[in-house]
Amino acid sequence: MNEEEAPSEQKKTLSLVPSPTTNLFLPDDILLSSLSRISRLYYPTFSLVSKSFRSLIASPELYQTRSILGRTESCLYVSLRLLNDSNLRWYTLCRVPDRKLTNFSGGHLLVPILSRYAPPAHWSSVVAVDYNIYAIGGPINDAPSSSVSVLDCQCEKWREAPSMRVARNYPTATVLDGKIYVAGGCEDCTSLDCIEVFDPKTQTWDSVASPGTERCERLVYKSVGIEGKYHLFGGAGHVAYDPKEGRWDSVGMDMEMGRTWVSYCVINNILFYYNDREFKWYDYKGRFWRKLMGLERLIKFLCYSRVNLAAYGEKMAVLWDTFVPSSSKNKMIWCAEITIERHDIYEICGKTEWFDVVLRVPKSYELVHVLAATV
């Protein structure tokens, strides 16, 4: 939709039921070849055709074919939590094949994933590596946890991965060069495993050299992976780890944002964040934050909302919920897709491709995680 006007809040109807003329008798190899060439965003709709289609869409053969054909793409996943419920509801963004079927002008919806089971990962740190989403640490049942749960986004089923070496509360996890770095939340800050790294290929955990006991003792707020370095932000400042050299360096306070980072993401080695009605990006050369231009109209719709950012391929996904009066029973989850355009070394602009309501939920639901997996 045009970002100058919001869609009507009237009740919107949707029919995703496929045409009864759909041919269900094609050989599986032809169906696989055809489905592999279609955007993954349409798969939730095709899964409604029949059990046979549902099985094909969750089959490893389909995703092997997509990979061979170079058809993998970024797919957005979102978790919501009902008040006083530790379990999460997971959704994925899909496209409606025929926009005439819906009054949602953007043609996008959040639909539940196939798996009904989801680990209690409200306070876990969640990251994606390829087509797997990892929910790491706790608290779970009010206690630190070393558990790691994995959502396979191809078949949309959860499984358990090897546990961390130490249990953690509120850890921060970051993906760098295909490995997952985890810090914070451990009770013994002098432990050699205060910071750990997980290799999804070997399914093993290893310790990372500590930046110092003082830095580990102070609360770690955030972490990011940029230009081959693992950055930690916390009460003791900002430090960066170079895995190739095995060395920590103090970066200083110029980039430090601590708890004020409401939401952030890294796209093409550029750090973006949203807070206090502003989108900003970090200029490494000038060593200060610059305003992300071009999103002034979108910001008007973000007031009084909890905003989540996610790297969505080379684009940015922005999700937020609407402020609702006490008399309302439901609220709306919105999504915007932003193209990032660099005009010169000093200016980056965002262009809103579309934004729309993608889900309507009871107002007691909370938007928790937003991230993209490559499927």
Swiss-Prot record:
Record Gene3D superfamilies: Kelch-type beta propeller
Positions annotated as Kelch repeat: 132-178, 179-225, 229-269
Domain of life: Eukaryota
One Pfam short name: Kelch_FKB95
SUPFAM superfamilies: Kelch motif
Keywords: Kelch repeat, Repeat
Domain F-box intervals: 20-66
SMART domains for this protein: FBOX, Kelch
Name by which UniProt lists this protein: F-box/kelch-repeat protein At4g39580
Species of origin: Arabidopsis thaliana
